[in-house]
């Protein structure tokens, strides 16, 4: 009994010491924040005194104050007010106008304020007690008395409802109050359904439907004007990038007491750019993705997009990110903001990746990067211990390059690029100069979803030759059965003979004879033959200008779009019979097939950098690179035009995109 008593006493003392230690650490974090407040410290102490008798609200206040350093606002909101007011004026006078006409007017205003650069200041130095108290009280009402957040525990409440703003530089105003009156259509009706009255999922769907109906937003890939942080103005903007609408949605949803956060991937693993979206914390404890004002919770949200990492924006500081900034001389921009956490495993199967980097980097930070079409972009970081670095929860079936950064910001590879396979293996790309291969390259970029649909209009198309202008009799030269989004070269037999009229004919319904490029070459000289363009007149009314001549203008981004769904055609009358030895054609697509006349350069990764395998001009619809090392990672660049380019490997005679 004595031994058991001593053991229990020891456990109690140990637990007490841990609690005291944690309390002291929390108090230290709070005191550090109060010290950073400077002359604004009395405002924050007033908040703490106000909640002295309410333990839970006091903890909420401490949470906000502890994590406030690093959150920023404009030092003087009056500096940006004239800009916001002019935007409001345009949105009022141009209500009902075409969204792109509105955009052009707003771009002019943006140019007028090109020199606007207001100073930033940390919230801890300017926030007022009354504002913070009102925010805390309002958030608690939404948590405890509204219908859609009662399932949250205190920690969840602190992140999903409590924060006094949704993003940096958002004005410190009474947004909860004025947004609460914004189109709460049908939300109150949920109280009449016992199944749905407490459903955060259904409330989010209902409110998001209202947002879409009110805003009808047009998504753009790039910002058209400087960010607008005043919510009353932002709610009226008819266009923007995904981050504009997701950040706005957080404030609108939280004003109604619906627990919503923002998730993002800093860089797609398979193409350029990154993406942001929302999540709602539903009653079963799961986060359900959606996109504010554009797609609802429960609808598939980019399910086939390959991601390397996913993070969630938080109000609380991430100690790992804070430590990173304290240790490293240079931190890439993606990781300078310390308010997000890793949630990759909520979205995909992922595994840790261990890499040997050598002893000389012990104690440094390494980064995992993915390719964004032009350069490697960091998506994760980890501390190097000894000669190894372990990256946690990494997405699979994607190519990565481990790097570190020099003090001046120069990126340096610390290993080979590698594929993280579905089998959870790390497969490095190492050029094998003892084993060589000839590369036949057909494209510089993978075929994405929006391209696949239109290229199928090439299916069943036919090439004919005839000496009859009406093609009552003709030779069938070629029938399209493979709808790959590449150019095709067709070599004709010597026995074919000469014909005056040559055409592409599309019998299939729904094809509209879509074709981007056709070129005929004389057998004897090998030169391109040009004649009078003949075929179906006109074009589809929804695509003016896309007449039959577009198939012969040498531009892969223009195409013939016939006025009839089937049995249209386009071709050439050479004025006399011509012996054509070959022809090439490219279907409607994205312009990323090999384009005759363009200059290209093939690069491959070797010894920490890209090495050139040579530049050449495309003479046909493919490029041949002979005597190339096997097992390398390649990158084909179009030096003449375009931006879309992608890394690939070469396997079984084909380009495999990463």
Q: Where is each model-derived feature located?
A:
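Bacterial Sec-dependent N-terminal signal peptides
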Residues: 1-28
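Hydrophobic/aromatic-rich core segments of domains that either
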Residues: 26-38, 50-53, 193-210, 219-232, ...
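Secondary-structure boundary elements
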Residues: 46, 57-237
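A short, amphipathic beta-strand motif
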Residues: 350-359, 444
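Short, acidic Ser/Thr/Gly-rich low-complexity loop/linker segments typical of extracellular
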Residues: 374-387, 616-618
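Short Pro-Gly-centered beta-turn/loop motif in secreted/extracellular proteins
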Residues: 388-401, 405-408, 496, 626-630
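Structured interaction patches on ligand/partner-binding surfaces of diverse proteins
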Residues: 407-434, 520, 646-658
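Aromatic, loop-rich ligand-recognition surfaces of beta-strand-rich domains
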Residues: 436-475, 482-658
């Amino acid at each position: 009994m004595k031994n058991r008593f001593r053991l229990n006493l020891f456990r109690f003392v140990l637990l007490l010491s841990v609690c005291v230690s944690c309390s002291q650490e929390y108090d230290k974090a709070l005191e550090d924040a109060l010290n950073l407040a400077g002359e604004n410290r009395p405002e924050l102490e007033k908040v703490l005194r106000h909640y002295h008798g309410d333990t839970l609200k006091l903890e909420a206040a401490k949470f906000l104050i502890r994590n406030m350093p690093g959150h920023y606002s404009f030092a003087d909101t009056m500096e940006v007010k004239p800009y916001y007011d002019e935007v409001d004026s345009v949105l009022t006078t141009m209500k009902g106008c075409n969204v792109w006409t509105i955009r052009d007017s707003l771009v002019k205003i943006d140019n007028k304020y090109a020199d606007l650069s207001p100073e930033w200041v940390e919230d801890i130095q300017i926030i007022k007690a009354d504002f913070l108290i009102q925010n805390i009280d309002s958030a608690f009402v939404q948590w405890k008395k509204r219908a859609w957040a009662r399932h949250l525990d205190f920690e969840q409440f602190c992140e999903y409802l409590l924060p006094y703003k949704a993003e940096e530089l958002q004005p410190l105003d009474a947004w909860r109050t004025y947004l609460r009156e914004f189109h709460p259509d049908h939300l109150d009706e949920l109280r009449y359904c016992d199944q749905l009255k407490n459903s955060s999922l259904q409330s989010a769907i209902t409110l998001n439907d209202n947002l879409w109906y009110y805003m009808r937003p047009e998504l753009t890939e790039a910002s058209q004007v400087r960010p607008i942080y005043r919510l009353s103005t932002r709610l009226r903007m008819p266009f923007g990038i995904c981050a504009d609408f997701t950040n706005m949605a957080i404030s609108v949803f939280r004003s109604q007491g619906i627990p919503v956060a923002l998730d993002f991937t800093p860089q797609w693993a398979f193409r350029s750019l990154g993406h942001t979206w929302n999540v709602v914390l539903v009653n079963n404890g799961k986060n359900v993705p959606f996109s504010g004002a554009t797609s609802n919770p429960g609808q598939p949200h980019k399910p086939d997009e390959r991601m390397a990492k996913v993070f969630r924006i938080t109000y609380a500081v991430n100690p790992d990110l804070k430590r990173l900034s304290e240790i490293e001389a240079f931190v890439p921009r993606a990781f300078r903001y310390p308010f997000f956490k890793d949630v990759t495993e909520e979205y995909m199967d992922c595994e840790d990746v261990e890499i040997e980097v050598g002893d000389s980097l012990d104690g440094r930070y390494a980064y995992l990067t993915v390719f964004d079409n032009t350069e490697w972009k960091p998506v994760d970081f980890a501390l190097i211990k000894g000669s190894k670095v372990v990256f946690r929860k990494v997405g699979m079936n994607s190519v990565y390059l481990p790097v570190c950064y020099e003090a001046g910001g120069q990126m340096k590879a610390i290993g080979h690029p590698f594929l993280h396979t579905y089998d959870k293996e790390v497969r490095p790309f190492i050029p094998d100069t003892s084993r060589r291969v000839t590369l036949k390259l057909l494209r510089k970029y993978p075929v994405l979803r929006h391209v696949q649909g239109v290229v199928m209009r090439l299916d069943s198309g036919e090439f004919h030759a005839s000496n009859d202008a009406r093609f009552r009799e003709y030779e069938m030269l070629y029938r399209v059965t493979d709808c790959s989004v590449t150019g095709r070269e067709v070599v004709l037999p010597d026995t074919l003979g000469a014909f005056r009229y040559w055409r592409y004919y599309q019998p299939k319904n729904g094809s509209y004879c879509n074709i981007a490029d056709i070129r005929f070459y004389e057998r004897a000289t090998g030169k391109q033959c040009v004649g009078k363009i003949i075929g179906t007149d006109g074009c589809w009314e929804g695509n003016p200008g896309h007449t039959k001549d577009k198939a012969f203008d040498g531009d892969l981004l223009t195409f013939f779009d016939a006025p009839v769904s089937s049995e249209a055609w386009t071709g050439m009358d050479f004025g006399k019979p011509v012996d054509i030895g070959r022809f090439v054609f490219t279907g409607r697509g994205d312009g990323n097939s090999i384009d005759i006349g363009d200059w290209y350069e093939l690069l491959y990764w070797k010894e920490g950098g890209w090495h050139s395998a040579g530049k050449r001009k495309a003479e046909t619809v493919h490029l041949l690179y002979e005597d190339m090392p096997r097992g390398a990672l390649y990158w084909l660049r179009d030096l003449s035009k375009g931006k879309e380019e992608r890394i690939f490997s070469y396997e079984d005679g084909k380009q495999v995109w990463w």
